[in-house]
C-alpha cells in the first residue's frame, strides 16, 4: 500500500488518419509514420529520433531500410525532414539527427490527387 498513491503514467494517445490507407504506402512506411506520430511533440508536430532509434522500436535491422521508408513518407508529403547540427564540447560541428515535421494530412491528399489527375491525363 506504500505505493498506492503513485499515479500510473498516462498512455500516449494519438490517432492515425484513415486517409493513410489510400495513399499506396508500404507497410514499413506506415509503421515508421505511426512511430513518428507516437514520439512527436503534440504542439510543434516535430520529433528527432535517429534511424537507429526508429529501427530498434520497429525491429527493422537496417538503417538503410528505415531511410527508404522515411523517403517514401517525404515523397508522399506526409513528413518534412531537415538536417540538424550538434556542436561538441571542443567546438566541432557534427551532423545530428534529422528533424521530422509531421505535415497535415491534407497536404498528402492534395499531392496524391494531383498525381492521380496527371496519370489520368496521360492515359487519355
Predicted features, each with a name:
Residues 1-56, 63-64, 71, 93, ...:
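Short recognition helix of helix-turn-helix/winged-helix DNA-binding domains
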Residues 63-124:
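Winged-helix/helix-turn-helix nucleic-acid-interaction surface
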Amino acid at each position: 500500500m506504500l505505493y498506492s498513491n503513485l499515479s500510473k503514467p498516462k498512455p500516449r494517445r494519438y490517432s492515425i488518419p484513415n486517409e493513410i490507407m489510400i495513399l499506396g504506402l508500404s507497410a514499413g512506411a506506415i509503421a515508421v509514420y505511426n512511430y513518428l506520430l507516437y514520439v512527436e511533440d503534440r504542439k510543434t508536430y516535430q520529433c528527432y529520433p535517429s534511424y537507429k532509434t526508429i529501427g530498434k522500436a520497429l525491429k527493422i535491422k537496417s538503417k538503410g531500410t528505415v531511410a527508404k521508408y522515411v523517403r517514401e513518407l517525404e515523397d508522399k508529403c506526409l513528413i518534412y525532414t531537415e538536417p540538424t547540427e550538434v556542436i561538441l564540447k571542443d567546438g566541432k560541428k557534427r551532423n545530428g539527427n534529422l528533424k521530422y515535421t509531421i505535415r497535415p494530412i491534407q497536404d498528402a491528399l492534395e499531392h496524391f490527387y494531383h498525381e492521380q489527375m496527371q496519370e489520368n491525363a496521360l492515359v487519355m
